[in-house]
Amino acid sequence: MIKNRLINFFSKKEITAPIRNKMMMNWSNEKNFYNQRKTKEKLRLKEGRPHTVFYFHSLSDPYSHLTIQVIKKLISHFNIVLEIFFISQPSENFTPERKMYRKHCLKDSKEIAPFYGLKFEAEEFYLKENENLAYKILDYFSDMDQGDYIDLIFKVSSLLWDNDKAGLTSIISELSNDESELLNKKITDINIEGDKKIQSLEYYFSASFHYEGENYWGIDRLGYLEDRLIELGLKKNNSDKNIVKKLEKSKFDPSQIIEKDDPLILEFFPSLNSPYTYISFKRVKELIDRYPIKLLTKPVLPMLMRNMKIPTHKGKYILSDSAREGRKHGSIIKDIYSPIGSPANRAYSLFPIIDSYGSGFRYLEELTKASFFHGINIGNEEFLEELSNDLGLPWDKIRVKLDTDNWRSILEKNLKDMYSGNSWGVPSFKLTNFDNSNPYYQWGQDRIWLIENEIIDRLSSRR
């Protein structure tokens, strides 16, 4: 019974707010993070196990097509054992708005690939009929040398995304003496073992790595795995630290800004219950300080207040990963008080009037800091009064809007705008020219660098 309640504990009332907040703090706590590493390493030594990294791949995942291109580098640079598993795509509880998610993965993978020196050029998803043949090939040749098998996975994946059925068939002719045996072989579900394995490790996404208690998703988090392996002394040589480096664009020279130039418009879509939103504020502010940008802050309701579910495994990963990212970017997650429900509603009710004073961004920034660093109930009226005063605002005029409902239609309008850019989660971003033309959307704090790249491109084109 308890287990069933925990499946979607974020949205269940059976588990009280204090218990939920404590669990969230345990998952994001830095001391717990490093203690787990020490415990896992002691256990590994005691059991005499090698340094084993698990890699989870799905042919239908564009991000997996990126990660398979770096696997051989990982093996050649580190003294590790790599085990490869194929897995199914997670349920809709883990990936709400599935159609939007699939479209996003395709677009995002194609957009980031060149910056990592990788290839992915598919404009659309492959024909489903070719997937079974692809998995038959990978299942049939799974006993070959691992390096050759990794090459085969990449080749099969490339042909699949190119919808090249003839190319897939030619692989069989090249590698098998009995083509009919492979084609007629009744394939077992190649994903069964991988699905069980990844569930046992409390994770759900493909294109991911797992090493001794920690999950690392895709190219974006591979650096964390490398750092950990380096700390354990597993680097084989003194080659460059990162096996995959992101190409950085040169920063735009502020001296080139012409005073009469119209600023770009950046719309920022945050929510109050998102740790990823909290750790993004600092970098968004840096963009505003660095470039001629007009910022529009457009909050939306948290996913849980939009009747979406967050399974426990996902919640745990979100907290641990956002804390890890926060430490990297200088936005520490410490004490947590989740504002879901009444606290968020009360805080949102003041946003329209506070934003009319030009303080909407700072207000939401301080609210998320209160929730994810100070552990404060942001629905407390004394706190809201103190925050209003800190922002230099007249509390007597602000407080009359507390617990009113006019904010709901504003947030609903913001949500529709965010969805129009194929973004359903936060933080999301929309960059336009000053006349609102040429909208460019990005979802997630992971892609703030792409927003900056687009800003640089647009400003540079004016020179």
Identify the meaning behind each predicted range.
Residues 2-6, 10, 19-25, 33, ...:
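C-terminal cap of thioredoxin/glutaredoxin-like
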Residues 41-48, 253-261:
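Short boundary motifs at domain starts and secondary-structure transition points
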Residues 47-63, 77, 81-82, 260-275:
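Short active-site neighborhood of thiol/selenol oxidoreductases, capturing the structured segment around
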Residues 57-61, 99, 215, 271, ...:
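Short, charged/polar micro-motifs that form catalytic or ligand-binding hotspots
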Residues 58-60, 125-128, 267-273, 337-341, ...:
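Conserved strand-turn element in the central/C-terminal portion of the radical SAM core barrel
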Residues 59, 65-160, 279-371, 462:
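Structural alpha/beta surface segment adjacent to cysteine/selenocysteine redox centers
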Residues 101-105, 186-190, 276, 314-318, ...:
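Soluble or luminal CAZymes and related metallo-dependent hydrolases
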